[in-house]
From Swiss-Prot:
InterPro entries: ClpA/B, P-loop_NTPase, TOR1A_C, Torsin. The gene is Tor3a. Glycans are attached at N120. Keywords: ATP-binding, Cytoplasm, Endoplasmic reticulum, Glycoprotein, Nucleotide-binding, Signal. Transmembrane segments: none annotated. May not form homohexamers. This is Torsin-3A. Gene3D superfamilies: P-loop containing nucleotide triphosphate hydrolases. The lineage of its organism: Eukaryota, Metazoa, Chordata, Craniata, Vertebrata.
Amino acid sequence: MFFGAFWLLLLLLLPPLRPPGAQGHRGAKSPEQEADEPIPWPSIQRLREQLRTAGTLSKRYWALFSCTLWPDHCEDQETPVPPLGWSLPLWGRRSLDMLTSWFCRFQDCCSAGNCRISNNFTGLESDLRVRLHGQHLASKLVLEAVKGYLEMPQVGKALALSFHGWSGTGKNFVARMLVDNLYRDGMRSDCVKMFISTFHFPHPKYVDLYKEDLQRQMQETQRRCQQSTFVFDEAEKLHPGLLELLEPYLEPRSPETHGAELPRAIFLLLSNLGGSVINEVVLGLLKAGWSREEITLQHLEMPLQAEIIKSADSSFGSSRLLKKHLIDLFIPFLPLEYRHVRLCVRDAFLGQDLPYTEEALDEIAKMMTYVPEEEQLFSSQGCKSISQRINLVLP
């Protein structure tokens, strides 16, 4: 096949062939002289014409393909592809559409970024089941809420999920896992924005500047993307003015106010607020003979919301987001036990492609502090800082 393609290319590149005995080139001929000369090697000439036609057709397909993927660049072409005098056949258009669809699975094909949205719910379900430990409740609630929202034919508001639990229980981990399965570029996607309260909005005196910048980013992202995700870490430390800014983005809206279809948006609010009451409820249920997997949202929802509302250390509980019930779901992250920490240690070894022993897993898991003092049941740091502790046991 390679040699066949080579000879076809050679035929296209060779100068016009002459029959034996013909004179070499001695200068330009007039059109009358060229017309009087017999056409040499008729069969080869016909083959060359067919190949040139095929080449022109290939160029036309490529032009249509590139214009489909990058319409902005298509308009800038200085030399348009010469027409063949007939329209592109239906089978050619279908082939072009199939090729475009396949290409867009791997490459960014549009300036809007929407062709990089994957919504891989199968991958999300697998990641939550395999990589997240001790959070059967959060796994179920996150998957059901996000999948249900994105599969709705039309939406009337943004989806607002509030993650609550102690540090190291997996709130950030789940947020990143979610983004990685909804967007091919993960956290690098133009449709994803992450804000850390103490990093992006550290000084209360600059709150007006923060509000202006935050509003600009959210508006630009929603204008660019039909599906956007906004992550707010340490949400309990957000300034009241910034919480108020989120209100119109989370309120229900009718399609008439925004055109035919509302852009979909997911807001994730990550907070340590309510972690203590979650731990108290879980500890009480375990002492009463319940298994961890039997704990449901009904056990935790009311105590968690009550704790958030009465918290004096944060303006989150007194914000209009809660008063107007704009948060769709409060998702509790349970405290992690020794067995869960041990699984996190194993994953950390595997993630760094390091060999491990059962003794090494136990050694690192025992380095963590466990509470309450009497029961020593829950890791006070969850699975945080485990990767750094691996270095302490390496030879």
